[in-house]
Amino acid sequence: MQSYASAMLRVFNSDEYNPAALQNIPDSGKSSSVIWTDNSSSKDQWQTGENSKGSVQNRVKRPMNAFIVWSRDQRRKMAVENPQMRNSEISKRLGYQWKLLTEAEKWPFFQEAQKLQAMHREKYPNYKYRPRRKANMLQNNDSLLTADPSSELCGEMQAEDRLFTFSYSDNSKKSTQSTMEHPLGLSPPVNPDSSPQQRDRCSHSTNLQDNRVTLTTKIYADSPFYR
């Protein structure tokens, strides 16, 4: 579905400009603060950005633990003394200082945290901690690689991997039967224009196939049943 801005631009730039054509343009997308909700129970309602902000503001916070109670004043003090220090560095230093405190020094803050937790339990009896989901999940580096003939070749090599079967005659002569398209010891050519990472992956895949064949051969050859 085209946006409102692109539809307006197409109408104004056309040679046959007609003001009546503006009436056929849908009103969706006029404001960037309007968000469409996919919830079927909302009956196709429009939700503004202010309402979404309000739902975030109404989120119940977790009760403070002993470390948070202690670090409130310490964080302000350290931020005033070191205005150029980042918040992450302040948190690291506060965590290190908290570990250096004795149990007797930490005990008053544990008591304060227990009181806050009791008050929080009375105010929100049905409260359940729900961690926030990360908006951007880290993706695997392999999925970021662009597809080229070399990567497809690696996939074909893995798909064509087959186990070698051996049949023994009475005179213990071994005959090998392979269903692989490429002969053993010869790997398919790799595209020279591919990236070094993909060439390494193809080489690693070929080595794995050779190791499988060697291991299977050794298992059948050393088996006492066929000796």
Swiss-Prot record:
Top-rank taxon: Eukaryota
InterPro entries: HMG_box_dom (IPR009071), HMG_box_dom_sf (IPR036910), SRY (IPR017253), SRY-related_HMG-box_TF-like (IPR050140)
Main function: Transcriptional regulator that controls a genetic switch in male development. It is necessary and sufficient for initiating male sex determination by directing the development of supporting cell precursors (pre-Sertoli cells) as Sertoli rather than granulosa cells. Involved in different aspects of gene regulation including promoter activation or repression. Binds to the DNA consensus sequence 5'-[AT]AACAA[AT]-3'. SRY HMG box recognizes DNA by partial intercalation in the minor groove and promotes DNA bending. Also involved in pre-mRNA splicing.
Region (Disordered): 23-56, 170-205
Pfam families, A to Z: HMG_box
Cellular component annotations (GO), alphabetically ordered: cytoplasm; nuclear speck; nucleus
Subunit text: Interacts with CALM, EP300, HDAC3, KPNB1, ZNF208 isoform KRAB-O, PARP1, SLC9A3R2 and WT1. The interaction with EP300 modulates its DNA-binding activity. The interaction with KPNB1 is sensitive to dissociation by Ran in the GTP-bound form. Interaction with PARP1 impaired its DNA-binding activity.
Compositional bias (Polar residues): 25-56, 170-180
Key word Coiled coil present: no
PROSITE patterns found in the cross-reference section: HMG_BOX_2 (PS50118)
UniProt keyword annotations, A-Z: Activator, Calmodulin-binding, Cytoplasm, Differentiation, DNA-binding, Nucleus, Sexual differentiation, Transcription, Transcription regulation
Matching Gene3D superfamilies: High mobility group box domain (1.10.30.10)
Family: Belongs to the SRY family.
DNA-binding region positions on the chain: 60-128
Alphabetical GO biological process terms: cell differentiation; male sex determination; positive regulation of gene expression; positive regulation of male gonad development; sex differentiation
Molecular-function GO term, any one: RNA polymerase II cis-regulatory region sequence-specific DNA binding
Signal peptide: none
Coiled coil feature spans: none
Species this protein is from: Callithrix jacchus
Protein name: Sex-determining region Y protein
Cellular compartments annotated: Nucleus speckle; Cytoplasm; Nucleus
